[in-house]
Design a protein with these regions (language model features):
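Soluble extramembrane regions of membrane proteins in the secretory/endomembrane system
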Residues: 2-7, 74-80, 111-113
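Hydrophobic cores of alpha-helical transmembrane segments in multi-pass integral membrane proteins
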Residues: 9-38, 46-72, 81-107, 116-121, ...
Length: 372
């Protein structure tokens, strides 16, 4: 079984894990007809069946039980701070499956000329607040309170000793809900990773249903009729947020190095890494000259790259990949949509640039505290 642990540790390397997820994702959540064709041909639509969720839950439970036999895995997973993230994995998997299962079921019903499962004709199209809703909320409140009571008794609160200014924890991790931001800080300047990126990702996720409006398909679960919007939403939610939290919780160890879930957290593990800016690649590596004294001349190449990315890419996408969406949304809504998308995509782009080229910043102007 040692080889199995080695395989898991290897696959858990974020460069391999993230690349695999990015490649597989559009086949699981197809955004277009081409991906939909392969989605069906590969039988991936069956993962939203009831049998699939049973197999998935059993598989995850079996993996966790097996992993608890390993000291390193047990130490990470059973840490009181990390227990909620273990639960988060199960909850995200289940509720993603639940929504997609209902969406696929409704798509089949609509294709057969039937009404969606959420449709009720009068007078049965309303649910009374009292007693129906209040009873359900009361029962949920009691169950949640009992669960939290058992949790608080069974798990010691992760409260440590008063902060010692002479001793820094290694690794120093933020609370789980900020671990996604802490992971972004590896690839972006603090103003970008701590304020701009998370704000735009959250605003983009909230704005998606309003940008891609479709009144005829509102009020019930459906995937087929809003594939592009749902696929992009799920990518932002699952890959750019949930996955970063999981990576920061389980795979980041001492000195903020990557470790597999079965790997010993060696505090002396050091990886030789020298990050360089885009201007240094251009002038020092390619042109074999020193950096110019002029800030504008030094950073002109990075500025041109970003201008091309933000000014040329949107109209290019409007004529190719997003051609149908541009016709449906119009110029104003499409502009908002595509700007939010390409800003969100700067995160995986910067991640790959760091992993492949050790690129730190495309534009680096520390004189004015502006780095991107």
């Amino acid at each position: 079984m040692g080889s199995f642990k080695e395989i898991v540790n290897t696959v858990s390397n974020p460069t391999i894990l993230f690349t695999s997820v990015v490649i597989i994702f559009p086949f699981i959540f197809p955004p277009s007809d081409w991906f939909e064709k392969w989605h069906r041909r590969l039988g991936l639509h069956h993962i939203w069946s009831k049998k699939a969720i049973i197999i998935a839950v059993i598989g995850m439970v079996a993996f966790f039980i097996y992993g608890l036999g390993d000291y390193n895995f047990q130490k990470i997973v059973l840490k009181p701070d990390n227990v909620p993230i273990s639960g988060l994995i199960f909850l995200v998997v289940f509720f993603t499956w639940l929504a997609m299962n209902q969406a696929y079921s409704n798509d089949e019903r609509l294709d057969d000329g039937k009404k969606p499962s959420e449709f009720y004709e009068a007078p049965n199209d309303k649910v009374l607040v009292w007693p129906d809703l209040v009873y359900v909320e009361l029962i949920s409140l009691i169950i949640a309170s009992a669960f939290l009571l058992v949790w608080s008794i069974g798990l010691a609160a992760p409260i440590e000793e008063p902060a010692n200014p002479t001793e820094s924890p290694n690794p120093a991790k933020a609370p789980w809900y900020f671990l996604g931001l802490q992971e972004m800080l590896v690839y972006f300047d603090p103003w970008m990773a701590g304020v701009v990126m998370p704000s735009l990702i959250l605003v983009g996720l909230m704005a998606m249903p309003y940008i891609d409006r479709n009144p005829e398909n509102s009020g019930f679960f459906s995937y087929k009729r809003r594939r592009m919007a749902i696929s992009l939403f799920m990518f932002g939610w699952l890959v750019l947020w949930i996955m970063l939290i999981i990576v920061g919780t389980f795979l980041r160890g001492p000195n903020w190095n990557f470790f597999g879930p079965f790997e010993y957290w060696d505090i002396h593990k050091l990886e030789a890494l020298t990050n360089i800016n885009f201007s240094e690649i251009i002038y020092i590596k390619w042109l074999n000259t020193g950096l110019p004294d002029s800030i504008l001349l030094r950073e002109i190449w990075g500025i041109l790259v970003l201008l091309g990315y933000f000014l040329i890419l949107p109209p290019l996408l409007a004529k190719t990949v997003f051609k149908d969406m541009y016709a449906r949304l119009g110029s104003a809504r499409y502009s908002i949509f595509v700007v939010l998308i390409i800003i969100a995509l700067t995160l995986p782009i910067k991640m790959y640039l760091r992993w492949i080229f050790n690129l730190k910043y495309i534009i680096a102007i520390p004189e004015y505290f502006f780095n991107f």
